[in-house]
C-alpha cells in the first residue's frame, strides 16, 4: 500500500485506514481478527477507534489483537475522546474528562501511548483553551504523540489550529476527521481549503456514504443491512433521495466500465481528493473489507473522475465561490 504523510508530521501511513466502529457490536472477535490480518497483509498501518465505540469493548478488542499479532511497532493507533454516550451532555472536552478518558483508553488498548488522539466533537460548554491545554499535557507526558480533531466546522478548525500554532511550546494539530464521500462533499466548502492553509490532513469517515455507495441499496434493502435495522435505518436513509440515486447510478456505470465494484471506484475517487490522507474503511465483515482494500490497485481515468465530480458537485455558492 502506498504511504502518505499523516498531516504535517513525520509519520507516514497507508492511504487506506482501518475503522473499527462495528467491532464489539456487529463485528465479533473472529471477524475483527480476520479484518486486522487482511489489513496488515495489504500493507495498512493506520487504525482508527474511539473510547465510546461499543462502550469501550472496541478498544479492548483492538488492544488484544495488536498484542496477538505483535504489530504495535508497525501500526499507528488513533483513538478519540469527548463523546459521552447515553448522557444528557453529549460532549465533554474538559481537562479532567479528557485526561481521565485518555488513561482509560491506554488501559483498554494495552499500550503506553496513543499515536493520534482526536477530539471527537466540538464541546460548546468547555473553553477551547482548556481543551487545548489538556492536549498539550497529554503530549508532554508522553501518553500522546500527535493530536487532531473530528467533526469540527471550518471556523472551529481554524480557531483550534491557529491557537495551537501561535502558542509557544504547543504541538500543532495535524488531522481532522470528517464525513466525506461522493454523497457528502460539504467539507469542500470550508474544511478542505482550511486544511490546506493550516497544514492538516483529512481522514474521511463513512467514505462509502454509509454503505449506499456500494450499490447494495439500488433496487432493494437487504434484510441483513443497516438500512433494514430500526436502530440504524435513519443513518442510511439520509442518502435515499433522487440526488443520491443519480450519483449511485453514475458510479455503477463507471464501475462496470472499469470492471471494478462501485465501492472500489468510490474509494479511489475519494482517496485522490486534495488534502485526503486515508479514507477510513469501517467494514462490518472481512469480505466487505477485502473488497474495499481492492481500491488500492485502482487508478481512475481522468474522464471518470471528471464525470463523478460533475454528478456529485456540491454547488459552491456565496461566499465560498
Placement of each model-derived feature along the sequence:
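N-terminal binding-site loop/beta-alpha segment at the start of enzyme catalytic domains
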Residues: 1-75
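N-terminal small/glycine-rich loop or linker at the start of catalytic domains
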Residues: 7-23, 78-90, 113, 118
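Acidic (Asp/Glu)-rich catalytic clusters
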Residues: 8, 64-73, 106-110, 139, ...
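Short, well-ordered coil/turn segments that N-cap beta-strands
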Residues: 11-16, 43-46, 71-75, 111-115, ...
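Conserved beta-strand positions
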Residues: 18, 49, 79, 116-119, ...
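Short, acidic/polar
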Residues: 27-39, 93-109, 157-161
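Active-site groove signature of glycoside hydrolases
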Residues: 106-124
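Beta/alpha (TIM)-barrel catalytic core signal, keyed to glycine-rich beta->alpha loops juxtaposed to Asp/Glu
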Residues: 123-310
Amino acid at each position: 500500500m502506498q504511504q502518505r504523510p499523516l498531516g504535517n508530521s513525520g509519520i507516514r501511513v497507508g492511504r487506506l485506514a482501518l475503522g473499527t466502529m462495528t467491532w464489539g457490536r456487529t463485528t465479533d472477535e473472529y471477524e475483527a481478527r480476520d479484518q486486522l490480518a487482511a489489513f496488515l497483509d495489504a500493507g495498512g498501518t493506520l487504525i482508527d477507534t474511539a473510547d465510546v465505540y461499543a462502550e469501550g469493548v472496541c478498544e479492548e478488542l483492538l488492544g488484544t489483537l495488536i498484542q496477538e499479532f505483535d504489530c504495535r511497532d508497525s501500526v499507528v493507533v488513533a483513538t478519540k475522546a469527548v463523546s459521552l454516550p447515553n448522557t444528557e451532555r453529549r460532549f465533554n472536552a474538559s481537562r479532567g474528562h479528557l485526561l481521565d478518558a485518555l488513561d482509560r483508553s491506554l488501559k483498554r488498548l494495552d499500550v503506553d501511548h496513543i499515536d493520534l488522539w482526536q477530539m471527537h466533537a466540538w464541546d460548546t460548554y468547555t473553553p477551547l483553551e482548556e481543551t487545548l491545554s489538556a492536549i498539550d499535557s497529554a503530549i508532554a507526558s508522553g501518553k500522546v504523540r500527535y493530536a487532531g480533531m473530528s467533526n469540527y466546522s471550518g471556523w472551529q478548525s481554524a480557531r483550534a489550529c491557529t491557537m495551537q500554532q501561535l502558542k509557544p511550546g504547543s504541538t500543532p494539530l495535524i488531522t481532522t476527521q470528517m464525513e466525506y464521500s461522493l454523497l457528502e462533499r460539504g467539507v469542500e466548502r470550508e474544511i478542505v481549503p482550511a486544511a490546506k492553509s493550516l497544514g492538516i490532513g483529512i481522514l474521511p469517515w463513512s467514505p462509502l456514504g454509509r454503505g449506499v455507495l456500494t450499490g447494495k441499496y439500488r433496487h432493494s434493502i437487504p434484510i441483513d443491512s443497516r438500512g433494514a435495522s430500526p436502530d440504524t435505518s435513519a443513518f442510511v436513509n439520509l442518502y435515499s433521495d433522487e440526488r443520491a440515486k443519480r450519483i449511485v447510478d453514475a458510479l455503477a456505470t463507471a464501475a462496470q466500465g472499469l470492471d471494478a465494484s462501485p465501492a472500489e471506484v468510490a474509494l479511489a475517487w475519494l482517496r485522490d481528493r486534495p488534502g485526503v490522507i486515508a479514507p477510513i474503511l469501517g467494514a462490518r465483515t472481512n469480505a466487505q473489507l477485502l473488497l474495499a482494500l481492492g481500491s488500492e490497485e485502482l487508478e481512475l481515468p481522468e474522464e471518470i473522475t471528471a464525470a463523478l465530480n460533475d454528478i456529485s458537485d456540491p454547488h459552491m455558492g456565496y461566499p465560498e465561490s
